[in-house]
């Protein structure tokens, strides 16, 4: 809890507003910081009386995750619902000091770790906390967005390689493909961790621990893309194998000779072509 500065927001519409106003902050300052939402006054209608201008806490009944930059500055907050309500995750909107495209969650911890061989990029705050709790180093998460070029550049400052460790659902798999494109555009080597049984990172490490995590297959970008293409084609038919081979050709053409030879051998085994 102390390592990540975790906290909680009470189930109240204005607990934070009242506490911060008591310290001298105005509603305008709290709104600019992304901590409250202000609703303008509403005139009376036939169905209800007039309503005054009101301020509501942004985070209510949520576990709170401070978003801290690599220099130790608290820039924003993320909140996870304690009860089964939507949205499950809620983040501070962009403010004069915070842009979710530019940073990653746990950047402050990455800076403290020395000689990292790779950064493990996950989808959510809970995955970061869970993997770190089990002893995995170099873990961080994007801030409710797909990986951006700016975030990739930041990760490159901490380690020479990025391991994508996303959920196995369709959204997670799509995010992996986009992430690989971004990392390759920035010249950053990448791998994709292959979780079994449809488990997400948190579920897997709670089942298999750090020892199991360290043994996970780390797929090259081309191996991952070929696997995705294979799932989209029927390799029991000649037409499916031909379409699959053609789709893979676009992936293989930019590989180094040794990598291309290995990938071609795998493709020959899968399709029967030579």
What are these regions (language model features)?
Residues 1-11:
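Conserved alpha/beta enzyme-core scaffolds, especially Rossmann-like or related mixed alpha/beta domains
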Residues 9, 56-57, 99, 240-241, ...:
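Residue-level marker of regulatory loop/turn positions in helix-turn-helix DNA-binding domains and
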Residues 8, 122-124, 143-144, 167, ...:
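Small/polar loops that bind or transfer phosphate-bearing groups
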Residues 189-267, 271:
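C-terminal or mid-to-C-terminal helical accessory/interaction module adjacent to the motor/catalytic core
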Residues 274:
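Electropositive nucleic-acid-contacting surfaces
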Residues 10-14, 23-29, 107, 152, ...:
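Alpha-helix initiation and N-capping motif
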Residues 147-225:
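Conserved phosphate-handling catalytic cores of large alpha/beta enzymes
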Residues 13-162, 175-176:
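Phosphate-handling DNA/RNA-contact segment within nucleic-acid enzymes
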